[in-house]
Amino acid sequence: MRVKGGTVSRARRKKMVKLAKGYRGQRRINFKVAKQQVWKSYLYAYRDRKNTKRNFRKLWIARINAAARMNGLSYSKLMHGLTLAGVELNRKMLAEIAVTDFDTFAKLADQAKAALASDNVLVQERVAATLETTVKVDR
């Protein structure tokens, strides 16, 4: 006896229309349109999972920058100073500290300033040494 695929087809269509729950108009009712919209929704979801990560990183950087400027540093100088000081906090944690505990953030900024100051001294010494060697070579 020949078996037609009515039950399987109905189940497949029903599953797709169920995924379209909450959509408006034909996108919720009509299988063909619902299927297209569900596929499009999957694409949006994939894209926006990536965008969420970007958006949070931008938000953290904006918060850190605002707090850093209150302490007399730019974002880039703060991050470079923290790297020189050996502070290994990620942007998410730094942003959380900046929002919730400003005193601790000020201490971190002071550490960054101290590390930048000592690094500037080393750079100036290296520049002076380079200039001395070039003057000796020219003579």
From Swiss-Prot:
Q: Which Gene3D superfamilies does the UniProt record give?
A: 6.10.160.10, Ribosomal protein L20
Has UniProt tagged this entry with the keyword Ribonucleoprotein?
A: yes
> Which controlled-vocabulary keywords does the entry list?
Ribonucleoprotein, Ribosomal protein, RNA-binding, rRNA-binding
What is one term from the GO cellular component aspect held by the record? ribosome
SUPFAM superfamilies in the record = Ribosomal protein L20 (SSF74731)
Which PANTHER family does this chain map to? 39S RIBOSOMAL PROTEIN L20 (PTHR10986)
What's this protein's family per the entry? Answer: Belongs to the bacterial ribosomal protein bL20 family.
**Under which name does UniProt file this protein?**
Large ribosomal subunit protein bL20
Organism for this UniProt entry: Leuconostoc citreum (strain KM20)
